[in-house]
A protein has these predicted regions:
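Charged catalytic cores and adjacent phosphate/nucleic-acid-binding surfaces used
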Residues: 1-16, 20-37, 58-62, 66-74, ...
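Divalent metal-dependent hydrolysis catalytic cores, especially in the metallo-beta-lactamase
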Residues: 36-56, 116-118
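Glycine-centered short loops/turns at secondary-structure junctions
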Residues: 43, 69, 112-114, 168
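Short, well-ordered beta-to-alpha junction loops that form the rim of enzyme active sites
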Residues: 52, 120-122, 175-177
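Short acidic (Asp/Glu) patches
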Residues: 98-99
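Short, charged N-terminal beta->alpha structural module
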Residues: 102-112
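Aromatic-lined carbohydrate-recognition surfaces of secreted/lumenal glycan-active proteins
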Residues: 114-127
Length: 262
């Protein structure tokens, strides 16, 4: 076995900011099981489905993830006082009780190291970014996100990196995937723990060296993002609002392939 393969085997790929069609806010066209299929193909070990203002809690998806060796962490992307934050290993009841950053501090005081909170896309002008307020609320966060959308001079992550260095806060790369093809290129790698548990993943994120994979956006990526943000998604959202919510029925067949619509 080559040294590169040995080295790769000692690390686990994780993505802690992903959306699926379960999202109550955005119109997503791929399912949690389709995400699991792709994650397995690409060798991911840890995922978090971060619905907007809701905790992903579908027990069958957690069971199916575990069956293929993927640790799925319950999570949510919550907007507080106009700013998005991502909370990992939280319950729906805990998220429902969050209205202010002071509530976040109280939650952290109760839960300690058993939760992990990071600031997504903090200095991007769209999408509920926390902006300069991050400096005031930095004690609420365990990490700062390295946003996937960057190219050349278009890179607000530079400001995020300065804040992270100033406060000694780790940065983590994520995909923030809203389309399935966007998943898999932007992620964080952690040293492989002896046992793959939420506790060990959080400890690695806080204390271990991290590898961040986040290549610059290509011209195709830029065009796709602009099309999605300003054309495709607003159209799908209006169409869904006119039609009303729809629900899919889980398949009774076995295997992830049979569950790709859920």
């Amino acid at each position: 076995m080559s040294m590169s393969k040995i080295d790769s085997a000692d690390w686990i790929k994780i993505d802690l900011h992903i959306h699926t069609l379960d999202d109550p806010k955005d119109v997503i066209d791929y399912s949690a099981h389709e995400l699991l299929e792709r994650a397995k193909q690409l060798g991911f070990g840890v995922l978090a489905i971060t619905l907007h203002d809701a905790v992903f809690e579908r027990a069958e998806v957690f069971a199916d993830a575990a069956a293929i060796g993927i640790l799925l962490i319950p999570a949510a992307e919550v907007r507080l006082e106009g700013a998005d934050i991502i909370l990992l290993n939280v319950s729906a009841a805990e998220v429902a009780g969050l209205k202010t950053f002071e509530d976040v501090r109280q939650l952290r005081a109760r839960r300690g190291l058993s939760i992990f909170i990071f600031a997504p896309h903090p200095f991007y002008v769209l999408g509920g970014s926390i902006g300069e307020r991050l400096l005031e609320e930095i004690d609420c966060f365990d990490a700062i996100e390295l946003c996937h959308f960057h190219k050349g001079l278009l890179n607000p992550n530079r400001r995020a990196a300065k804040v992270a260095a100033r406060f000694g806060t780790p940065m983590i790369a994520t995909s923030d995937a809203h389309q399935l093809h966007a998943f898999g290129r932007h992620y964080t790698s952690i040293p492989r723990p002896r046992e793959l548990t939420i506790e060990n993943v959080f400890e690695a994120l806080r204390k271990s060296p991290l590898r961040l994979t986040s290549p610059p956006a290509s011209i195709v990526d830029l065009a796709s993002a602009i099309y999605w943000i300003f054309l495709a998604h607003p159209f799908k959202l209006r169409k869904t609002q006119r039609r009303g919510p729809t629900h899919t029925t889980p398949s009774c067949s076995s295997g992830l392939e049979s569950k790709s619509q859920t």
